[in-house]
């Protein structure tokens, strides 16, 4: 599953 791959990490510092 790609659900584990997409940990929703924001590209903002």
From Swiss-Prot:
Keywords: Amidation, Amphibian defense peptide, Secreted. GO terms for cellular component: extracellular region. The modification Proline amide is found at residue 13. Expressed by the skin glands. GO terms for biological process: defense response. Coiled coil: none annotated. The keyword Secreted applies. Transmembrane segments: none annotated. This is Electrin-2.1.
């Amino acid at each position: 599953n790609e659900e584990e791959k997409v940990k929703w990490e924001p590209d903002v510092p």
